[in-house]
Amino acid sequence: MGLPKEHRLKHWRDFKTIYSQGKRFRGDALAIILLPQPAAPTKIGISISRKVSKKAVVRNLIKRRIRHACRTLLPQIQPGWHIVIAVRYNARECEYEHFLQELKRLLIQAEVFHGH
C-alpha cells in the first residue's frame, strides 16, 4: 500500500522546483529536500537513481520500504511541505527500521516533525 493520493508528489515540475529551491538535509542512506507550500497538504516524492542499483527490483523494494516509513510518519509531519526523499547509494543494505529512524531524524533536523 502506497501513500494516500493527496500526499503524493507526481509531476516532474514539482520535483524540479523542489530540487532547485528546497532546503537539503543529508543522512547515510537518505537525503531530503523540503520546500514550504503553506496552503497545501504535505506531499512526498521519492527519487532513486540507477546508481543505487541497476536492478529495478532492488530499486522498487527500497521505494516500498521508504513509502511504508513515510506512511508511518505522515501523521506527525507538519502540513504545508513538499518533500523529496533522495535515496543514496548506502540504502541498498538498509532495512525498513533503518529508513524509519533516519527519516525521522532528518525530519526532526528539518524542524517539520511534530513534538520536536
UniProtKB/Swiss-Prot annotation:
GO molecular function per UniProt: 3'-tRNA processing endoribonuclease activity; ribonuclease P activity; tRNA binding
UniProt keywords, alphabetically: Endonuclease, Hydrolase, Nuclease, RNA-binding, tRNA processing
GO cellular component, one term: ribonuclease P complex
Catalysed reactions, as listed in the record: Endonucleolytic cleavage of RNA, removing 5'-extranucleotides from tRNA precursor
Enzyme Commission number, as recorded: 3.1.26.5
Record-linked Pfam families: Ribonuclease_P
EC supergroup of this enzyme: hydrolase
An example Gene Ontology biological process: tRNA 5'-leader removal
NCBIfam families: rnpA
Role of this protein: RNaseP catalyzes the removal of the 5'-leader sequence from pre-tRNA to produce the mature 5'-terminus. It can also cleave other RNA substrates such as 4.5S RNA. The protein component plays an auxiliary but essential role in vivo by binding to the 5'-leader sequence and broadening the substrate specificity of the ribozyme.
Similarity remark: Belongs to the RnpA family.
HAMAP family attached to this UniProt entry: RNase_P
PANTHER family noted in UniProt: RIBONUCLEASE P PROTEIN COMPONENT
Assembly with partners or alone: Consists of a catalytic RNA component (M1 or rnpB) and a protein subunit.
Protein name: Ribonuclease P protein component
Organism for this UniProt entry: Picosynechococcus sp. (strain ATCC 27264 / PCC 7002 / PR-6)
Gene field: rnpA
